Amino acid sequence: GDVYKRQAQETAPLPKVLYETMTKNQGLAVSLDRPSCQDTGVLQFWVKCGTNFPLINELEGLLKEAVVQATFATPLRHNSVETFDEYNTKRNVGKGTPTVFWDIVPNDDHCEIYSYMAGGGCTLPGKAMVLMPGAGYEGITDFVLDQMTSYGLNACPPLLVGVGVATSVETAALLSKKALMRPIGSHNENENAAKMEKLLEDGINAIGLGPQGMGGKFSVMGVNIENTARHPSTIGVAVNVGCWSHRRGHVIFDKDLNAVCDTHSTIDLNA
């Protein structure tokens, strides 16, 4: 993964040791079949589903059941606290969780499920706001860099930074989460947006957060921007962040429920 790449590119002694520890940690997680971090996060799913997919009506219930099973089988840390009542459900499900974001595709019978484990540290830098139109793309840049200099240290860098640009806080926030579903190293299809991804990546790297915020050449693994058209009088912008272990999965089902997982090559879902 990208941590191995950053390890090879780093030259200073301390960050090299930290990267070596990270890669050893990942190797142990695989060999021992254990989570790579004690904070296994809140389970979130982004579902791109065709209207003719046979399990579309049951899908949210199945995902909730899968989270409960994984909580005890893996095991996963209990990370679902009911707000206002302030008790832990101890099953990783509760009111509105796991969160399922939907993209409905008409006249299609496939289903793509992105899974994401949103840890506490990497969630902390998340923020959304609406800028005056005169702030322009410089305002977007300032917003992102301010969040990274203020909170990036606590988010277990190097980070994957998702940026959403739209009209309002909720549309920008959803896009910034969707940006984290894209692979590291991918680029926005809009040439100007792709240029901004690179400029932001270079700018955040120049902060020098390094692995675990201890200093180094790299602060991020990449910056992914997702965007929509906006109202001419507003610029909605949001940031979401993934930590160095960036626990993301992607499974594709056809109408016969044959499955392919392109993020984890050792998993055979059809066995």
Predicted segments — roles?
Residues 79-271:
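A structural signal for small-residue-enriched, beta-sheet-centric alpha/beta enzyme cores
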Residues 41-106:
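A generic, well-ordered mixed alpha/beta core segment in the N-terminal half of proteins
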Residues 1-4:
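Short, small-residue-biased leader/transition segments that mark boundaries at the very start
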Residues 8-34, 89-94:
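Translation machinery proteins
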Residues 32-33, 46-48, 55-58, 126-128, ...:
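Short, glycine/acidic-enriched capping/hinge loops at junctions between secondary-structure elements
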Residues 37:
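Catalytic, metal-anchored helix/loop core of enzyme active sites in primary metabolism
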Residues 25, 66-77, 118, 147-151:
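Mid-sequence acidic-hydrophobic segments that form the walls
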